[in-house]
Swiss-Prot record:
<dbReference type="GO" id="GO:0005978">
    <property type="term" value="P:glycogen biosynthetic process"/>
</dbReference>
<dbReference type="InterPro" id="IPR011831">
    <property type="entry name" value="ADP-Glc_PPase"/>
</dbReference>
<keyword id="KW-0321">Glycogen metabolism</keyword>
<dbReference type="InterPro" id="IPR056818">
    <property type="entry name" value="GlmU/GlgC-like_hexapep"/>
</dbReference>
<comment type="similarity">
    <text>Belongs to the bacterial/plant glucose-1-phosphate adenylyltransferase family.</text>
</comment>
<dbReference type="InterPro" id="IPR011004">
    <property type="entry name" value="Trimer_LpxA-like_sf"/>
</dbReference>
<feature type="binding site">
    <location>
        <position position="190"/>
    </location>
    <ligand>
        <name>alpha-D-glucose 1-phosphate</name>
    </ligand>
</feature>
<comment type="function">
    <text>Involved in the biosynthesis of ADP-glucose, a building block required for the elongation reactions to produce glycogen. Catalyzes the reaction between ATP and alpha-D-glucose 1-phosphate (G1P) to produce pyrophosphate and ADP-Glc.</text>
</comment>
<dbReference type="GO" id="GO:0005524">
    <property type="term" value="F:ATP binding"/>
</dbReference>
<comment type="pathway">
    <text>Glycan biosynthesis; glycogen biosynthesis.</text>
</comment>
<comment type="subunit">
    <text>Homotetramer.</text>
</comment>
<dbReference type="InterPro" id="IPR023049">
    <property type="entry name" value="GlgC_bac"/>
</dbReference>
<dbReference type="InterPro" id="IPR029044">
    <property type="entry name" value="Nucleotide-diphossugar_trans"/>
</dbReference>
<dbReference type="GO" id="GO:0008878">
    <property type="term" value="F:glucose-1-phosphate adenylyltransferase activity"/>
</dbReference>
<feature type="binding site">
    <location>
        <position position="164"/>
    </location>
    <ligand>
        <name>alpha-D-glucose 1-phosphate</name>
    </ligand>
</feature>
<keyword id="KW-0119">Carbohydrate metabolism</keyword>
<dbReference type="InterPro" id="IPR005836">
    <property type="entry name" value="ADP_Glu_pyroP_CS"/>
</dbReference>
Length: 380
């Protein structure tokens, strides 16, 4: 099967900085914005950009992620000219081996990529929130004759030392790469989005692992090698909204930004939809005792308490006398009577008993998936 460009999403990360929220699932499967999961944004970007054949490389706790993606029907990837393939670590003649890094994950799946026979390979992270046209990036890649194009975004100078920084010339050619430099020379941060000419990348990876010169990571190994070897490496400047939601603070802030009617993601844009797989649920019920202000409430929820500036995912229940402010309530969570929740993230299926106070004023409070807090007496 010949593809001009194959999309490969790296979705195997543990997401340890998200703590309890990734205890039993990979970071790309974490719910976001009421009715989505983080990986939905990357998958939807692929589909909207015309990239209809996608491999999703998983590793850590893949069950929820695999179930969410399924056969790709929610993204229109279930027909003869499209498809999504889940790629997990497997045993070969050399035995089983976990992916050691981003580039190693690609190397371990060369068989799948060769079967798809792409001219270009688009390598993506499955744990960022953004909307991006990869076709425009491919157009630039072709125009410049690049061997590798790296998507970059300008970050605040005081945050640049937290990223891989690309230093470019006047033609946007990358001349130097620094991984989390103490004194950055530019603020062009790598987004972890790459377009490679597949034939050349394949050659580099095979030669490297055959000679035990393991290039396990794109940022630490492959990009520096390309630059040192004189390959044509260009930056693609991205100007839109992009969030790395790898920490509790960043995940909470990104969700709160979602409540702004003028947020940069603009999910009302019918020309660039974000698709997801959502359970069929009845309409939400707003009880007579409920008070709701500046909130997002998804289907299947029952609200009898007060909700202010918060996101409530599908099938959430909030009983009478409870007050939820500045918080994210993930799918299936149940909150009892006279509960106070402020600046918190409540995990999927969590149960909060009556009269509990969860206060994240000093630090965002987190209740894990299926965690039970307090004594429950309300109806399930």
């Amino acid at each position: 099967m010949k593809n001009e460009m194959l999309g490969v999403i790296l979705a195997g990360g543990k997401g340890t900085r998200l703590g309890k929220l990734t205890h039993n699932q990979a970071k790309p499967a974490v719910p976001f914005g009421g009715r989505y999961r983080i990986i939905d944004f990357t998958l939807s970007n692929c589909v909207n950009s015309g990239v209809k054949n996608i491999g999703v490389i998983t590793q850590y706790q893949p069950l929820n992620l695999n179930a969410h993606i399924g056969n790709g029907a929610s993204w229109g990837l279930d027909d003869l000219n499209a498809g999504v393939t889940i790629l997990q670590p497997y045993s070969n003649n050399e035995g089983s081996k976990w992916f050691e890094g981003t580039a190693h994950a690609i190397y371990q799946n060369i068989g799948y990529i060769d079967q798809m026979d792409p001219e270009y390979i688009l390598i993506l992270s499955g744990d960022h929130i953004y909307k991006m046209d990869y076709e425009a990036m491919l157009d630039q890649h072709k125009e410049t004759g690049a061997s590798l194009t790296v998507a970059v975004i300008d970050v605040p100078w005081d945050e640049a030392s937290r990223f891989g920084i690309m230093n470019t010339d006047d033609n946007n050619r990358i001349i130097d790469f620094e991984e989390k430099p103490a004194e950055p020379k530019s603020n062009h941060a790598s987004m972890g989005i790459y377009i490679f000419n597949w034939k050349r990348l394949r050659e580099v990876l095979v030669n490297s692992f055959t000679r035990n010169q393991d290039m396990v990571d794109f940022g630490k190994n492959v990009i520096p090698y390309y630059l040192k070897s004189g390959e044509s490496v260009f930056a693609y400047n991205f100007k839109g909204y992009w969030k790395d939601v790898g920490t509790i603070d960043s995940l909470w802030h990104a969700n709160m930004e979602f409540l702004d009617e003028n947020n940069e993601l603009n999910l009302q844009d019918r020309t660039w939809r974000i698709y997801s797989r959502n359970p069929i649920a009845p309409p939400q019920i707003i009880a007579e005792t409920a008070e709701i202000k500046d909130a997002m409430i998804v289907d299947g929820s029952y609200i009898a308490g007060k909700v202010d500036h918060s996101i409530l995912s599908a099938n959430v229940r909030i009983q009478t006398g409870s007050v939820v402010t500045d918080s994210v309530i993930m799918p299936g969570a149940k909150i009892g009577k006279n509960v106070t929740i402020h600046r918190a993230i409540i995990g999927e299926g969590a149960v909060i008993g009556d009269d509990v106070v969860i206060d994240g004023t000093d630090e965002i409070a987190v209740i894990g998936n299926k965690e039970v807090v307090g004594v429950t007496s309300h109806e399930e």
